[in-house]
Amino acid sequence: MLNIIWLITGILLLFAIMIHNPKSQGFGTQNQIFGSTRSAEQTLNKATWFLILLFFILTVVLSINNEF
């Protein structure tokens, strides 16, 4: 079960990183989804950091479970 969550988290993390625009202008349809560019970037940054943390925690938990 944790393996599936870890896999989904990894895929979502890749997607979140790929939709970041390096020039901080956001992605094309963000005005339709969010109220402003700044709001979209903040939400995307929070989601990305959450996924990074979740991925790291799951990686540690899965590696500990494999030892025993």
UniProtKB/Swiss-Prot annotation:
The keyword Transport applies. Its main location: plastid. GO terms for molecular function: protein-transporting ATPase activity. The chain crosses the membrane at residues 1-21, 44-64. It is a multi-pass membrane protein. The keyword NAD does not apply. It is found in: Plastid, Chloroplast thylakoid membrane. InterPro entries: SecG. It holds the Pfam family SecG. GO terms for biological process: protein secretion. It comes from the Eukaryota. One of its GO terms (cellular component) is chloroplast thylakoid membrane. Keywords: Chloroplast, Membrane, Plastid, Protein transport, Thylakoid, Translocation, Transmembrane, Transmembrane helix, Transport. Involved in protein export. Participates in an early event of protein translocation across the chloroplast thylakoid membrane (Potential). Belongs to the SecG family. This is Probable protein-export membrane protein secG. The gene is secG.
